[in-house]
From Swiss-Prot:
Quaternary data: Monomer.
Region annotation (Interaction with RNA) ranges: 150-155
Alphabetized GO MF terms: tRNA (guanine(46)-N7)-methyltransferase activity
Pfam families tied to this protein: Methyltransf_4
Family the entry assigns: Belongs to the class I-like SAM-binding methyltransferase superfamily. TrmB family.
Enzyme Commission (EC) number: 2.1.1.33
Residue stretches spanning the membrane: none
Annotated HAMAP family: tRNA_methyltr_TrmB (MF_01057)
Name by which UniProt lists this protein: tRNA (guanine-N(7)-)-methyltransferase
Catalytic activity as recorded in UniProt: guanosine(46) in tRNA + S-adenosyl-L-methionine = N(7)-methylguanosine(46) in tRNA + S-adenosyl-L-homocysteine
Top-level taxon of origin: Bacteria
Length: 239
């Protein structure tokens, strides 16, 4: 499995300016289980980065709606969603190999055939490998909020990124985001509301209740116990 992780920053026209990452590499040490999963299940469920567009029917062996999850962490919610929706296909992207290993192990244990994973930067994957108008949904749950003002430019939700996601969604496709940091939720709302071609699915034109389709993570459960809020945003591509 290759692990060449990079992420470009864009100018106002969406062109890469220079290399800047929206994440911090925290590879950590692989557990024996994660290492075993990477060695044994990656050949079946893993997708290497290339500069060739993916053919989803060929990748999954069928025609089905495809959901892309960016930054799936340890993969618990992604595996749960793939298990609950066998009629759909799921592609997850995560830059940290322990998380990829954990996700592969869980997916194998559940016997999933509708899940594939990548270990690469999602921005480059979107540019180079995801065909336009091909995704039913893009999910971005709890991305790094980059709390300090001087680091705000590292937040993955910026206008060029949201435009890029829109180009990959089918007409009627959904971009679903969630964060537990209210200033980032406000930033997401401002960015998404500024882009022509997206429709906010919130009745109050801000946030939506957590949909049943998004599992509550252990991290989120802990936050609830501590009184922390979570904000979900869902925007539909309408043109």
């Amino acid at each position: 499995m290759k692990n060449d992780v990079i992420s470009p920053e864009f100018d106002e026209n969406g062109r890469p300016l220079r290399r800047i990452r929206s994440f911090v590499r925290r590879q950590g040490r692989l557990t024996k289980g994660q290492e075993h999963a990477l060695e044994n299940y990656w050949p079946v469920m893993g997708v290497e980065f290339s500069e060739d567009m993916l053919d989803f029917p060929a990748l999954f062996g069928r025609e089905a709606p495809v959901t892309l999850e960016i930054g799936f962490g340890m993969g618990a919610s992604l595996v749960a969603m793939a298990k609950d929706r066998p009629e759909q296909d799921f592609l997850g992207i995560e830059v940290h190999s322990p998380g990829v290993g954990a996700c592969l192990a869980s997916a194998h244990e559940e016997g999933l055939s509708n899940l594939r994973v990548m270990c690469h930067d999602a921005v480059e994957v979107l540019h180079k490998m995801i065909p336009d108008n091909s995704l039913r949904m893009v999910q971005l749950f709890f991305p790094d909020p980059w709390h300090k003002a001087r680091h705000n430019k590292r937040r993955i939700i910026q206008v060029p990124f949201a435009e890029l996601v829109k180009s990959k969604l089918q007409l009627g496709g959904i971009f679903h985001m969630a964060t537990d940091w209210e200033p980032y939720a406000e930033h997401m709302l401002e960015v998404m509301s500024s882009i022509d071609g997206y429709k906010n699915l919130s009745e109050s034109n801000d946030y939506v209740p957590r949909p049943a389709s998004r599992p509550v993570t252990k991290f989120e459960q802990r936050g609830h116990r501590l009184g922390h809020g979570v904000w979900d945003l869902m925007f539909e591509r309408v043109k």
